[in-house]
């Protein structure tokens, strides 16, 4: 919205030309989202406590988690509010890529909200029935997939970018829709599975969003896109502002979610953030880099798949408990050690993924 206003005012006040610069708006986006989260946090936590909207803890989980019972959840509301207000203020709202990410973010946030609400009201860990959760996740993802395919058909926006091979960029055709669906739904659920310890999911999300901010900027800049041998997609550059909003809101939420957490994001936050990251990866054509950057999310998800598969096929468990962060807790690692080590791994994976952009 501000960019529209600046276009009008810059003819009278040259200062407003600053708002045309993507880097300036990205910085303001981080500051705005961070400020909103820090301001909103205490109020939301107090409101959730008054409503007795507390975390439901599994009885078969680590004993150290029993003390978390009753800690306010649904803190993802502050994240989504901060991101939404910030994007509305600083992003170019004529850019369809911005709306695609926001549609998934808020749509998945709504699904997560219903899931959290059912968990809190019924005081169990079941939440929204699985088939309905996947139905709404799938519906939202498919709407975006079909819309993006129709908009960018047979252009760089629907090519498959393969790491390490600068000349391998095949057109996906209708397979683009299927890939987009799996990336969005898969990333959403992967982040959701990772959100099991204080601050465990939010920092990798921040790291990945920061990585995608750079990739979006490079993809939208014709010189850098050619230099890195990646598709040039002009609309992608505005996603820098969206990624910056995720970073700012994430840091603001971490202020209250760091160990010992005052609030949990709940499914309203984790499903939404995962869906947004998946959508951004699709829009900048870096689905493979998402697998690398989001390696923590991938490993958490694989640990659940392997655990369930092994138990059904062999009657034996591979890990003491899945997702894998619980395995390390049951091995005796203090929760902060698990969290910080996963953060370090996540940061390194993002740096490795960015390095692959030049290794072609």
From Swiss-Prot:
The chain crosses the membrane at residues 27-47, 73-93, 94-114, 132-152, 168-188, 199-219, 236-256, 263-283, 288-308, 338-358. It is found in: Cell inner membrane. Keywords: Cell cycle, Cell division, Cell inner membrane, Cell membrane, Cell shape, Cell wall biogenesis/degradation, Magnesium, Membrane, Metal-binding, Peptidoglycan synthesis, Transferase, Transmembrane, Transmembrane helix. Pathway: Cell wall biogenesis; peptidoglycan biosynthesis. One of its GO terms (cellular component) is plasma membrane. GO terms for molecular function: metal ion binding; phospho-N-acetylmuramoyl-pentapeptide-transferase activity; UDP-N-acetylmuramoyl-L-alanyl-D-glutamyl-meso-2,6-diaminopimelyl-D-alanyl-D-alanine:undecaprenyl-phosphate transferase activity. It is a multi-pass membrane protein. InterPro entries: Glycosyl_transferase_4, PNAcMuramoyl-5peptid_Trfase, PNAcMuramoyl-5peptid_Trfase_CS. The keyword Cell wall biogenesis/degradation applies. It catalyses: UDP-N-acetyl-alpha-D-muramoyl-L-alanyl-gamma-D-glutamyl-meso-2,6-diaminopimeloyl-D-alanyl-D-alanine + di-trans,octa-cis-undecaprenyl phosphate = di-trans,octa-cis-undecaprenyl diphospho-N-acetyl-alpha-D-muramoyl-L-alanyl-D-glutamyl-meso-2,6-diaminopimeloyl-D-alanyl-D-alanine + UMP. Its cofactor is Mg(2+). Pfam families: Glycos_transf_4, MraY_sig1. Its EC number is 2.7.8.13. GO terms for biological process: cell division; cell wall organization; peptidoglycan biosynthetic process; regulation of cell shape. Catalyzes the initial step of the lipid cycle reactions in the biosynthesis of the cell wall peptidoglycan: transfers peptidoglycan precursor phospho-MurNAc-pentapeptide from UDP-MurNAc-pentapeptide onto the lipid carrier undecaprenyl phosphate, yielding undecaprenyl-pyrophosphoryl-MurNAc-pentapeptide, known as lipid I. Belongs to the glycosyltransferase 4 family. MraY subfamily. This is Phospho-N-acetylmuramoyl-pentapeptide-transferase. It comes from Aliivibrio fischeri (strain MJ11) (Vibrio fischeri). The gene is mraY.
